[in-house]
Amino acid sequence: MNRIKEFYRISRPAPKRELDDTACDRYYRRLRLQAFTAATLGYSLYYVCRTSLNVMKKPILDSGSLDASQLGVIGSALLFAYAVGKFVNGFIADYCNIKRFMATGLVVSASANALMGVLGLAQSVIPTAVVFVAFAVMWGLNGWAQSMGAPPAIISLSRWYPLKERGTYYGFFSASHNLGEFFSFLFVGSIVTFAGWQAGFFGSAAAGAIGGNVILCWLHP
């Protein structure tokens, strides 16, 4: 438990660098751009992991793996967990390392997608009821992990951009929802078309893994 607390502890201030005014300004602008890029691209890839099931619903129904009622329950599990998680994780994000917190959420979300793909591949030897329950649990876990995305991203933007610029950059950040849906339907949809819905979950998991690395490298607390 202590190791977990230490891992998510708020970072100590970085060592002071001896730079002239021009170099300092250039360095500051680079860090700001990296933080904005990580928040926006990272949250876009959060959306890929969140909306992947929407891309897979029709192929899953066509394959007879699950019916519409079961898919409705699975989707509701994500929404319920996401709603509760937004309330809880918004508070937690204020007291922890936002870079690691946001990256953890995306890695967990990607893992949930990957496990959905594994379950899909193994469905022929697993009872349908077990597949349904496992999907609901995994998608609920995904919903909770998804709630770990927005709070750290918004905190980062508020730290790096003053009030006179914050609205502009937050407006660009808000487009990450649409960007993520575009990535999901284009990238994941293409994978589903050529390799099946199970592979689609692996594709969204790969996108989440990429996003987690971007956040760890560029989202400066």
Predicted regions and their residues:
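Residue-level signature of mid-helix packing/kink "hotspots" within the transmembrane helices
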Residues: 51, 79-87, 181-182
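Helix-loop-helix hairpin linking two adjacent transmembrane segments in secondary transporters
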Residues: 173, 177-220
